Regions:
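Short Gly/Ser/Thr- and Asp/Glu-enriched loop/turn motifs at secondary-structure junctions
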Residues: 72, 108-112, 170-174
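Active-site loops of AMP-binding adenylate-forming
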Residues: 1-6, 38-41, 121
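Residue-level signal for inorganic ion chemistry
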Residues: 16, 94, 115
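Gly/Ser/Thr-rich phosphate-binding loop
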Residues: 1-2, 15, 101
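Adenylate-forming
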Residues: 31, 66-95, 124-145, 169-170, ...
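C-terminal boundary motif of the adenylate-forming
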Residues: 55-57, 97-123, 162-163
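Conserved ATP-binding/catalytic segment of the ANL
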Residues: 10, 17-79
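Conserved C-terminal "lid"/linker of ANL adenylate-forming enzymes
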Residues: 102, 127, 156-255
């Protein structure tokens, strides 16, 4: 059967395998022989046995044999226990909720995953008005207890979904915080096309990442920001660090 969440099964004459790195490899009589006058590129992409590197990370479902693509291979890492760490996959699940504008997952080389969240000011602001919650700024709304509880529900819903997936269950979010400011291209945190600059964010907010992994309940921080007129300033905040419920792996039969 055709499924929207997988690529499907390989057609006749095509072999698939998953490299130790998590990258999807294929082999077929129809694959290219070599790059024109570029043996180095050929060697980097195709091994001596004819397996071609796709550049994508994924896995083959054990029961259905269908291929599921997770992310670009270069963006996928490993957690401390060797399980796959695919941040964009989890971040996209979080951003499926209209209330979450942006998410950044951390966990490569760690025992567990933690996350930063940006609320969507428009969506959450409308919700706040309907629920008679007053606020004067993004920072004030993001720190509201009811907003934090809403984000916790979203995170735990994603965790429940991840717990159904043998390969991705290790990426459940154990702790999170709502950032006191939106990630901004003017501050170098995201690109103009809204792609998170993960390494930059991790370094800039190292105190917040460390606090999440250490198990602190709150953390005070001071962040340099760029205003609309180009002037620089500082934003101070005390952030609540939230524990999220995680779930045991739920074995399920993949759809046929």
């Amino acid at each position: 059967a055709v499924r929207s969440d997988t690529v499907g099964k390989p057609i006749r004459g095509v072999e698939l395998k998953i490299a130790k790195s998590g990258e999807v490899m294929y082999r077929s009589v129809g694959s290219f022989k070599e790059y024109y006058k570029n043996p180095k590129a050929t060697q980097e992409t195709k091994d001596k046995d004819g397996w071609v590197a796709t550049g994508d990370a994924g896995y083959i479902e054990e029961t259905s044999g269908q291929l599921r693509i997770i992310d670009r291979a270069k963006d996928v890492g490993k957690m401390k226990n060797g399980s796959m760490f695919a941040p964009k996959y989890v971040e996209n699940k979080l951003k499926f909720f209209p209330n979450i504008l942006e998410a950044v997952l951390f966990g490569a080389g760690q025992e567990k995953c933690v996350a930063f969240l940006n609320i969507d000011l428009s969506a959450v602001g409308n919700w706040a008005e309907r629920n008679n919650i007053n606020y004067a700024s993004y920072q004030e709304l993001a720190s509201n207890e009811k907003v934090i509880e809403m984000m916790k529900e979203h995170v735990e819903e994603v965790n429940q979904d991840l717990a159904k997936d043998t390969t991705m269950s290790g990426c459940q979010i154990h702790r999170f915080l709502i950032l006191h400011k939106e990630l901004d291209p003017d501050d170098g945190e995201i690109t103009r096309t809204r792609k998170v600059r993960r390494s930059f964010v991790s370094e800039k907010y190292d105190d917040l990442v460390s606090a999440l992994f250490k198990g602190d309940n709150e953390v005070s921080t001071k962040t340099e920001v760029t205003y609309e007129d180009g002037k620089k300033g500082y934003l101070e905040a005390t952030l609540t660090l939230v524990d999220a419920q995680t779930y045991m792996l739920k074995e399920k039969s993949d759809a046929a």
